[in-house]
Amino acid sequence: MTAAAASNWGLITNIVNSIVGVSVLTMPFCFKQCGIVLGALLLVFCSWMTHQSCMFLVKSASLSKRRTYAGLAFHAYGKAGKMLVETSMIGLMLGTCIAFYVVIGDLGSNFFARLFGFQVGGTFRMFLLFAVSLCIVLPLSLQRNMMASIQSFSAMALLFYTVFMFVIVLSSLKHGLFSGQWLRRVSYVRWEGVFRCIPIFGMSFACQSQVLPTYDSLDEPSVKTMSSIFASSLNVVTTFYVMVGFFGYVSFTEATAGNVLMHFPSNLVTEMLRVGFMMSVAVGFPMMILPCRQALSTLLCEQQQKDGTFAAGGYMPPLRFKALTLSVVFGTMVGGILIPNVETILGLTGATMGSLICFICPALIYKKIHKNALSSQVVLWVGLGILVVSTVTTLSVSEDVPEDLAEEAPGGRLGEAEGLMKVEAARLSAQDPVVAVAEDGREKPKLPKEREELEQAQIKGPVDVPGREDGKEAQEEAQLDRPGQGIAVPVGEAHRHEPPVPHDKVVVDEGQDQEVPEENKPPSRHAGRKAPGVQGQMAPPLPDSEREKREPEQGEVGKRPGQAQALEEAGDLPEDPQKVPEADGQPAVQPAKEDLEPGDGGLHPRPQAVLSEQQNGLAVDEGEKAEGVPPPGNAAGDTGQPAEDSDHGGKPPLPEEKPAPGAGLPPEPREQRDVERAGGDQAASQLEEAGRAEMLDHAVLLQVIKEQQVQQKRLLDQQEKLLAVIEEQHKEIHQQRQEDEEDKPRQVEVHPEPGAAVPRGQEAPEGKARETMENLPPLPLDPVLRAPGGRPAPSQDLNQRSLEHPERPVGRDPAGPPDGGPDTEPRAAQAKPRDGQKDAAPGAAGTVKELLKGLEQVPVPDPAREAGGPEERLAEEFPGQSQDVTGGGSQDRKKPGKEVAATGTGILKEANWLVAGPGAEMGDPHMKPKQMSRDLGLAVDLPGGAEGAAAQPQAVLRQPELRVISDGEQGGQQGHRLDHGGYLEMRKEARGGDHMPVSHEQLGGEEDAAVPEPRQRPEPELGLKQAVPGGQRPDNAKPNRDLKLQAGSDLRRRRRDLGPHAEGELAPRDRVIIGLNPLPDVQVNDLRGALDAQLRQAAGGALQVVHSRQLRQAPGAPEES
C-alpha cells in the first residue's frame, strides 16, 4: 500500500481533491449531533463502506470489461440500472451544487454586506448568489475545455481546506483545549444524531464517480493497486475530517452551527479564509457541472446502438450544451436560495442520491456479478437504511428548523453580519458596561459588600470579595476566550441575549440602578434561560469569585449583568432554565452545567449545595461563554433564538431587568452600587486592561502576520522573477543546445536537407561534423541523408542551406526549393515561414531566373538528378522560391540529374563548369542584388541552391529538409548574423583562396549558404566521385555515423582537391551564394569577389561533403523515384 501510494501519489492527490468538499464545514456540527466518540467511529465506518463500494466497482469492471459506472449498471441490470445510476449521479451533483450556493450565501453575504455597508438579509443574499452565478459560475461552466484550470482551482480549494483545518486547531487552543473546560461541555455519544449524520458522512466520502476513470488511467490496471490507492486517499480524508470535527466541536461545543466558519470572529485571517473559501467553491462549480451536464445529455438524448450499447458521451451540440448549462446553474441557484442551511441540503442529498450512488448501486452491481458477497450485503442494507431512515430523519429535523436551526439559518447565516457585529458589541460592551458601572457608582453611594455579592455577578466588578482572585482568573480566562469564544451555548442559553450594541451602556447603567432591588426584581425568563445552564437549579448568592467572574463577564457581555442578576435572583427559578429550548435535542442547560462544573471547582472556594455549585459553575461558564460567546454563541447562530435575541442585543432581558430593578431603587442598592462600582471600576479596569491586552496581543499578532505575509509575498515575487529569468536563460540555452544538437544530428545523421538552411548552432556542429566526416568515408553520409525520408538525406551543407533559407526568407526561398525539390511538402511547410522570403525573393527571383537560365544550360551531376525530381516538385509547388533561389539551380539540377543519370561523370564535370561559368556569370549580376538583400536580411543560399541544387535538391527536397528547415529557420536567423561576419571572413579568405579552412569555419555561419553552393560547384567532380561511391554508399548508408565520419575525411580530401576547381569555377556562384550573406558588408564589386572567395571556400568544404552526400543521394534518388 505504501509503495502504491508513493508511486501513485498524483492519483491519490486527485482523489483527495475530488472527495474533500463543502461537507468538511459540517464536521463539527455532526460531531455535536453524534458526540465525539460516536462521530469518529461513524466516520471510520463510512470510510470503510466507501472503500468497499469502490472495490465493488473495480472488481465488476475488471470482470465485465466495462469502464463506466453507467455501463456497469447496464451490464448488470439493463437499461433500468443504467437509468438509476445516471439519475442518482445527476441528483448527487445537483445537490452538491446547491450546497455550494448555500456556502457562498453564508460566507459571502456577510462579508460583502459589511464591505459595502448593506444590511444582511434574504434580498442581499439572493442578489449575491445571482451575481456569483452570472459572473463566475456561468462563464466557467460554458467553457468546454476547462479541466486543466479547474484542477488547479481544485488544488487551490484543497489549500484553503488545509488552512481551514489549522485555523480550527488554533481556535481550539485559544478556547482552552488544554484547560480541560471542554471535557464537561461536549458530549461523547449521542445516538439520536446518528441517522442525521450518517448521510452527511457518507456523502462527504463520495468518490465513486472517480473510481473507473482512475482505474483506466493506471499504466497497469489492477484491483490490488486500486485498493491501495483508494485506501490511502480515504485514510487521508478520514484523518482530515476527524481533526476538523473534533477541534471545531471543542472550540464551539454546543454553539456549533452547520457551517463552522460562521463562528469565527471577524479579523483579517478569518475574513480572508471565508472569502477564499467562497471563491474556491465558486470556481469549483464546473467540476460538478461538467459531469452533471454530460449525464443529463446522455440520459435525455443518448440513443442505444445496434449492438445494445450506448455511444460514449462525445461532442454536445452548442444549443443543448448552453441550455443544459443554464438550467443547471440557475436551477441550483434557486435551490441554494430556498434551502437556508448547508447541513440540510447535504443531509437530504446524502440520504437519497448519495446513498444510492455510494452504497446501494455498487453493492447491487457487485452482488449481481459476484453471486456470493457478504460485504456487498452489508453495504447494501446499510445503504438502504440510510436511504429510508436518514431521509425521514433529515426531513423531520428540517421541519423543526423554525425553532432550532431556523434561527440559526436566518440569524446565524442571513444575519451573520449582525451576529458578528453583536459579538463585537458584546466585546465592547464588556468594556463599556464597566465604564457605565463606574459612572453609576459615581452617582450612587457605595453599598455594603453583602449587596455586592448578590449584584456583583451583574455589576461585573467584584469588590472586596475573598474569591476575587478566582474571579479574576475566571475573568481573565473569559477574556482570553472572548475573541472567538463561541463557547457552546445550549439552545436555552440562546435566550441569553447579549446587550444590544447601542444600548450596552444604558442598559448596564439602568440594570445596575435597578440591580439593587434584585430581591424585589422578578427573575427574567431570559435570565432563567441563561440559568438553564443550571437547569432550573436555584442559584444561591454566588461566591465572590463566581460573582467576579460573572461581573467581568457581564461587563463584557452587556447582557450578562442582567442575566447574572436574573440567575442570582432566579436561583429559585430552575424552571426557566429548564424551559430553555434544547439545541439539537440537547438541553442547553446540560452543556452549560458541564461547562460550568469544570470551572466551578476553581470558582467556588466555599463548599456549596450541589445546586448552588452548579449554578455558580453555570454562571462562571456563562460568564466565560458570554466573553467567548459574544462572537459565536450570542451570534444567534449558536442557538435557536440567538438571532432574535442577539438582534435585540439582550434588549428583552434588559427591559425585564429594568422594570424589575426599576420597581424602586432603595438607597441600599445605590450604596451597594457605589461600592460595587468601586469594585466594578477596579474589575472594569482589570477587564479593560485584560481586554486591551488581548486586543493589543491580537493586533500585534495580526500586524506580525501581515508583515510576514508581505515579506513572504515579496520573497515569492522575487523568487518568481528569478525563476522567470532562469527559465528564460534555460530556454535560450536549451534552444541553442537544441539547435546545435539538431544541427549535428541533422548534418551528421540525417543530413535531411542539403538545401535547407542550418541554424548557426547547427552550422558550427556541422562544421565539426564535416571535419569528422572528412576524416571518415562519405558513404555513411548517404545513409544518413536517406535516413530521414528513406531518400538520400541532403548533405549538411544542404541542410544548412535549407536552414538558411528560412533564415533568409527572401533570398533563400529559391535555395529552399532546390533543396526541397524532393521535399515539396516540407517546402510547403517551409514556404509559410518563408513568406517573407518570398516577398524579398521576387527581386532575387529575377537574378535567380537568370542564374537558372545559366544553370539550365549547365548539366548537373547525378545527385542533381536525384534532387532534380524533388526540385521540380518544389519548383512547381514553390515556383517563386525554386526559381528565385534554386529555380535555375533546381531546374539545372533536374536536368543534370537526368543528364547525369545518362552521362554520369561527364555530365557532372560539364555541370560543374556550366554552373561555375554561365551559372556563376548569370548568377553574379543577379546574385549581387540578391545577395545584398539576402545578406542584409538573411544568409544567402541562392547560389548554394543553384549550384548545390543538383546534389542538394535530392536531400533538401526530402523530408529531412523539413526538420532542417524548421531548425534552419531558427538557426538560420542566428546563422544570418554569423553568416554576415563569417561571410566577410569567408570573402576575405575566399579572396585569399583558402576555401577549405574557411568553408569549415564558415560552415558554422556560412555553411548554410556557402556550403550548399560549393556542393553545386564541385558537383561535377562530386557527381563523378559520388556517382561511383554513391551507389556503394547507399548500401553502407545505414551505418550512418561511421560512414559519415569516413565520409567526412573523404569530403575534406575532396574539398582540398575540389577547392581550387570550386574556387575557380564556382567563384561567380559563390559570390552569388555566399555574397547573399556578406552583401550587406560588401559593395557590389567587392561582393562578387567576396562571393567568389566564399563560394570557393564553401565549395572547398561543402563540395567535398556534397560528394559523399551526392553519391549517397544518387542511390537515394532511385529510392525516391
Curated annotation (Swiss-Prot):
One of its GO terms (cellular component) is membrane. Its main location: membrane. It is a multi-pass membrane protein. Residues 434-691, 731-904, 965-1068 are annotated as: Disordered. The chain crosses the membrane at residues 4-24, 36-58, 84-104, 120-140, 153-173, 229-249, 272-292, 323-343, 345-365, 378-398. It comes from the Eukaryota. It holds the Pfam family Aa_trans. Keywords: Amino-acid transport, Membrane, Phosphoprotein, Transmembrane, Transmembrane helix, Transport. The keyword RNA-binding does not apply. The modification Phosphoserine is found at S612, S802, S890, S966, S999. InterPro entries: AA_transpt_TM. It catalyses: L-glutamate(out) = L-glutamate(in); L-glutamine(out) = L-glutamine(in); L-alanine(in) = L-alanine(out); L-serine(in) = L-serine(out). The modification Phosphothreonine is found at T772. Residues 439-454, 466-475, 493-508, 544-559, 645-659, 668-679, 731-752, 763-773, 802-811, 863-876, 976-998, 1035-1044, 1057-1068 have a biased composition (Basic and acidic residues). GO terms for molecular function: L-amino acid transmembrane transporter activity. Belongs to the amino acid/polyamine transporter 2 family. Facilitates bidirectional transport of amino acids. May act as a glutamate sensor that regulates glutamate-glutamine cycle and mTOR signaling in the brain. The transport mechanism remains to be elucidated. This is Solute carrier family 38 member 10. It comes from Pongo abelii.
